[in-house]
A protein has these predicted regions:
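Short glycine-enriched, charge-decorated loop/helix-capping segments at active-site entrances
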Residues: 42-48, 116-121, 185-186
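Proteins enriched for Cys/Gly/acidic motifs involved in redox and nucleic-acid/cofactor modification
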Residues: 41-43, 51, 203
Length: 269
């Protein structure tokens, strides 16, 4: 999935076309980010106040799509809005032109007074409102997001009638554990690859990024959690954190970090 943001239908249509050309299966519009910079561009969570405009945007995106599904990520409201009143209205107006999948962060967003980080934790969760949306609109795909810290917690909410649950930070910080649980739930085999194999397969991608002017730490900072909960995790993080930001850092930094982990693990056997 490719997530995009904006409030100009023509620009979002063009972004959708580019996403389709790149091979994405899903193009998601962000109606949830509360940061000042995002608000200044008139997109993100502030658009919860403009459901008619969001409807125009997703209509333009659907018309531009050559196969990718158009989906929406939103909050339950912003600032002093009453979620039980405005969220159903928002969903109804945005879905009337054929968008049927909504990932709902079950918190309000405060557009001032809280940082984006605080907006992920401080506003109270309202899972029941998201469940009510699904019960009253069974034809829509409703996916819960926000505060889901374990795989079991996500499955519990799905089993109460939702179509899915989105785990964000936990999946980012401990991807292998989440992937293993997902394989068990969906009877798939994605986790048969070892972490070592995944890292090895990342190397050509990293090299291509470097060859086109990118920096190593732009990728490795998203790989820090690969050994979470395993021996060698600290060495992995420390090696990447200390070396990947350097000007001429290349794939050898990742290879050395992996070598350090394997040495640590072998010493424990």
């Amino acid at each position: 999935a490719l997530q995009i943001g904006g409030s100009h239908p023509n620009q979002l249509a063009q972004a959708t076309r580019l996403g389709c050309e790149a091979g994405y299966d899903e193009i998601n519009i962000n109606i949830g980010c509360p940061s000042d910079r995002v608000q200044s561009g008139r997109f993100g969570a502030c658009l919860m106040k403009e459901p008619e405009l969001v409807s125009e945007c997703v209509t333009a995106m659907k018309e531009a799509s050559t196969g990718a599904e158009i989906t929406v990520k939103c909050r339950i409201g912003v600032d002093d809005q009453e979620p039980k009143r405005i969220l159903p209205d928002f969903i109804d107006k945005v879905s009337q032109n054929g968008v049927s999948s909504f990932t709902i962060h079950a918190r309000k967003a405060w557009l001032s007074g809280l940082s984006p980080k605080q907006n992920r934790d401080v506003p109270p969760l309202d899972y029941e409102l998201v469940h009510e949306i699904k019960k009253e609109r069974p034809e829509l795909e409703i996916i819960l997001n926000g505060g889901l810290q374990t795989f079991d917690q996500a499955v519990h909410e799905i089993n109460k009638g939702l179509d899915g649950a989105m785990i964000g930070r936990t999946a980012y910080h401990n991807p292998m554990e989440i992937l293993a649980n997902a394989d068990s739930l969906f009877e798939t085999n994605t986790n048969k690859k070892s972490v070592n194999k995944i890292i090895d397969e990342m190397l050509p991608y990293i090299q291509n990024h470097l060859d086109t002017g990118g920096r190593l730490n732009q990728i490795t900072r998203h790989m820090l959690g690969l050994f979470s909960g395993q021996s060698g995790a600290k060495i992995w993080k420390r090696t990447l954190s200390d070396e990947a930001h350097k000007k001429d850092a290349g794939v050898e930094v990742v290879q050395n970090a992996l070598r350090n982990v394997l040495e640590k693990q072998n010493n424990l056997e």
